Amino acid sequence: MQYFAVNAMIGKGAYAVPDFPDASSLLGHLDYLGIDRAIVYAVEARDASPYLGNQALLEAIAPFAERLLPAFVITPSNTFETGVIDWLRSQAAAGHRVFRLCPEVCRFPVRQIERVVAELTEFEPVLLYDSRFSGTESSFRDLEDLATRYPSIRVVICQQMWGGFTQVLDLMWRCRNVYLDTSWLHMRDTIELVRDHFGIDRLLFGIGYKSHYGAAIGALAQARISAADRELIAHGNLERLLQLAPPPAKLAPEHPLLAQKPLWKRFKDGHPLENVTIYDAHGHNGPHARGWVLATPDTPEILDILVQRMDQYGVEKLFVSDGKALFGDIVVENRRAERLAERHPGRFHGYFVYNPLYADDV
């Protein structure tokens, strides 16, 4: 299957040791994972100068133009810089229609980007919003305003994890031109939930940090969706937004190390792992009302679903802490969780939830 990632980055910046200091290092990572193409932005454009960093990006990825496509960082200052808006418009006219918003790092509220976006709307731009786990409430209100005022734009929420996830779902409900990438969706059954409520076309494939390696690929491979829907998320939806045809064949070569990694090959093909004992050391059960969004609210049913997922992935045991014990009566709820786990002998081991407010109860 082909993969087209929406949120890669290259370059050295002020705030972290880079995963990918240059285009070649990113391409090596994409090859290792079997990812054919990626939208990439320059850290220099985010941390220092958008205009100079965007120009340097084009030069850096030019030798790999078949596989690396640019995303240009934009900021409100572009409006006041001589020639920058004209340059952005010329790039959009040439087909480079992806732009990235990094308001927290670039120090501006989202609403201030409107003058720049207004200059680009005729090109149906794709705006990548850098959420980094959880964007602010004001940012999401500003994104709603932009998406409503300019229906020709496409807003993609990137790197969104469970924190504040309800505001993403709310924004997708309010605005049909808002999309979500899969890079940080480290929550159970989220791909299926978004599909059921908003349609499979609203999901785009993305990768996280280098340390994530194939997490997003594995999540997509194991999602309970059709093969056709999997292809749409992996590359088809982004190709449609950018009006690009898929390559006639995979661009990522088969990495020689994969021959030594039969477990990974089996998992990314959608099968459970075999001939290896796996204990998952960090899980939760019980109802959730603190940012998590799950279709099943009842604890006994959640345990049944967890066992189904464990069997699907090849996990033998799961170590869990109980949600109700975390936020309620530690004695009653820890005991209740233990009784519920007995319905699946040997599959669950519990972390005893302790709250010093109730030390005398233990």
Q: Residue spans of the language-model regions?
A:
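Histidine/acidic-residue-rich catalytic or RNA/ligand-binding cores of hydrolases
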Residues: A14-P18, S138-E144, F165-M172, T190-H197, ...
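Active-site environment of divalent metal-dependent phosphoester hydrolases
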Residues: G11-A14, A45-S49, P76-F80, R107-F108, ...
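Conserved, mostly hydrophobic/aromatic
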Residues: N7, L30, L57, I61, ...
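Acidic/histidine-rich helix-loop elements
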Residues: I10-P21, H284-P300
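Active-site gating/metal-coordination segments in enzymes
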Residues: D36-R37, A45, L52-L128, S134, ...
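Mid-to-C-terminal alpha-helical segments outside catalytic/metal-binding sites
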Residues: M1-I10, D19-R37, I200-R202, H212-T277, ...
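Catalytic pocket-lining loop regions of alpha/beta-barrel enzymes
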Residues: V98, V105-L204, H255-L257, W264, ...
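Hydrophobic faces of well-ordered beta-strands that scaffold small-molecule active sites
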Residues: Y3-A8, A38-V40, L69-I74, R97-L101, ...
